[in-house]
């Protein structure tokens, strides 16, 4: 996501202009293959300016030529350009209260390898870092990459975290982690640059970029699992708060006379609807004689599997949905989002939970804040954490500050491939020749890493009539072209 100041006529920084044009070009290619002439038309730049940038991107390995397109019978066939999604790798880590997952992603946030193991967050930081180091090495080996090809590491954790420093801040569900600097510790362990955020924040990014609500600018993502938290996306940007504590919906009091939760707040949402609370409730009702066919002992897995078929399980999920809806109505009235997406393990209860959430939230929300707000289940499932970590890393890399680092990684990956190809060419053939590769497949692309604001500004040139530029001033300096009203 490009979040740079736009150059003006007063401060003409040619390097900044070129960097911005480069990022806009990469954004276009991130969404599909294009010819140079298409890019020039889309960005309102001269062909010479585009060719200069493309030549540079090809030289570092970020862009590649992938074939030609018919010219309609007139002129030469246009060469298509493609973003090389394997030019750099991303290491995405989803650290939950009871699991750890590490994925190696390409630049489209598609998984190249994935490892998930049970892990109790209560085991503490050092045991967790050791495990993550082992999983990271195994995941990179499985993906066939070296650490030098990894541009960034992104990790989501189940508690409040200061995104700028990577330090955990008063996490109710991470005992022994308060004040722990995850960013610094993992950088020392992996010898790679690390970004850290709350898991619910990353869920919000994932659903807005890759889920059913892709492109949505105002979205609340509620992750309901061992704990309950929310990621708040406003105007396409995460709202983290002053210290990273925004979105702690699980600690909103929905009943001042209710039980005290882990945060110490009476009647908090987590004390009514967190995973272990629901299991304890179901066991107590089963012991009191409530009719049920749930297998003994009652577990979260059993409650999820029989959400629609067992009367006790259904009642538990309907009550949980009611309580979630009470808290969600607060977020609707505060932020007036376009969508609320429910993810996390509890969302696997499906329509039983969702129906109760909608009924409860709608009954408590002003009409202006609910009429056009959709409340849905997440569509990314267990992949939301790693996909969100990937989006966070793209937002850091595809910026003027991150671009030089991405260039360096891409050059390294290109050199590594060249050495491997040279070695393979000298080796004697083994077995029959491989079949010819199939024609390059096309896949539906997620929304680009540019915000809506940047798209509006970057597409202004192509919306103007080409013959009637009103009051435009042009500076042509070398291979740079800046169009200003």
Question: What is the role of each PLM region?
Answer:
Residues 456-485:
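Ribosome large-subunit tunnel/peptidyl-transferase-proximal elements
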Residues 111, 168, 238-239, 480:
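Hydrophobic "anchor" residues
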Residues 215-273:
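Glycine-rich phosphate-binding loop of actin/hexokinase-like ATP-binding domains
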Residues 111-218, 352-363:
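Glycine-rich phosphate-binding loop and adjoining helix at the ATP-binding site
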Residues 80-82, 90-94, 150-154, 219-223, ...:
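Short glycine-aspartate micro-motif
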Residues 199, 225, 389:
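Active-site glycine-centered loops adjacent to acidic/histidine catalytic or metal-binding residues
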Residues 1-69, 73-118, 122-148, 256-257, ...:
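ATP-binding/phosphotransfer module of carbohydrate and carboxylate kinases, centering on a glycine-rich
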Residues 106, 163, 233, 475:
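Short, acidic, Ser/Thr-enriched surface-loop or helix-capping motifs
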């Amino acid at each position: 996501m490009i979040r740079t100041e736009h150059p003006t006529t007063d401060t003409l920084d040619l390097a900044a202009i070129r960097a911005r044009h480069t990022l806009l070009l990469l954004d276009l290619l991130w969404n599909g293959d294009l010819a140079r002439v298409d890019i020039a038309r889309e960005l309102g730049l001269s062909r010479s300016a585009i060719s200069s940038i493309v030549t540079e991107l090809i030289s570092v390995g970020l862009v590649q030529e992938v074939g030609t397109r018919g010219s309609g019978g007139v002129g030469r066939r246009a060469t298509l350009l493609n973003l090389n999604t394997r030019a750099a790798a991303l290491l995405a880590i989803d650290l939950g209260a009871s699991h750890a997952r590490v994925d190696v992603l390409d630049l489209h946030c598609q998984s190249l390898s994935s490892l998930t193991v049970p892990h109790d967050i209560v085991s503490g930081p050092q045991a967790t870092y050791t495990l993550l180091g082992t999983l990271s090495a195994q995941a990179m080996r499985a993906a066939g990459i070296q650490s030098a090809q990894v541009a960034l590491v992104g990790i989501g954790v189940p508690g409040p975290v200061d995104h700028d420093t990577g330090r955990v801040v008063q996490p109710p569900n991470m005992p022994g982690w308060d004040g722990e600097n995850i960013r610094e510790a993992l950088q020392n362990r992996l010898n790679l640059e690390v970004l850290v955020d709350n898991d619910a924040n990353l869920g919000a990014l994932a659903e807005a970029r890759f889920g059913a609500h892709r492109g949505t600018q105002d979205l609340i993502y509620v992750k309901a699992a061992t704990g309950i938290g929310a990621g708040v996306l406003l105007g396409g940007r995460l709202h983290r708060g002053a210290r990273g504590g925004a979105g702690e919906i699980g600690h909103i009091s929905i009943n001042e006379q209710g039980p005290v939760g882990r945060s110490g707040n009476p009647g908090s949402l987590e004390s009514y609807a967190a995973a272990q609370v629901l299991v304890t409730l179901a066991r107590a009702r089963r012991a009191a004689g409530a009719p049920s066919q749930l297998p003994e002992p009652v577990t979260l897995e059993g409650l999820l599997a029989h959400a629609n078929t067992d009367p006790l399980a259904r009642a538990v999920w309907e009550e949980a949905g009611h309580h979630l809806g009470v808290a969600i109505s607060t977020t609707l009235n505060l932020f007036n989002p376009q969508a609320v997406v429910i993810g996390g393990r509890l969302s696997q209860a499906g329509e039983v939970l969702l129906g109760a959430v909608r009924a409860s939230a709608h009954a408590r929300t002003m009409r202006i804040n609910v009429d056009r707000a959709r409340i849905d289940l997440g569509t990314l499932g267990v992949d939301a954490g790693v996909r969100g970590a990937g989006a966070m890393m793209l937002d850091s890399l595809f910026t003027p500050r991150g671009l030089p680092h991405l260039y360096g990684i891409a050059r390294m990956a290109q050199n590594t491939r060249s050495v491997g190809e040279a070695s393979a060419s000298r080796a004697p053939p083994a077995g029959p020749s491989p079949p010819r590769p199939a024609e390059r497949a096309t896949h539906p692309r997620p929304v680009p890493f540019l915000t809506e604001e940047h798209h509006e500004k970057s597409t202004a040139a192509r919306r103007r009539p080409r013959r009637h530029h009103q009051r435009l001033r042009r500076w042509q300096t070398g291979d740079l072209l800046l169009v200003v009203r």
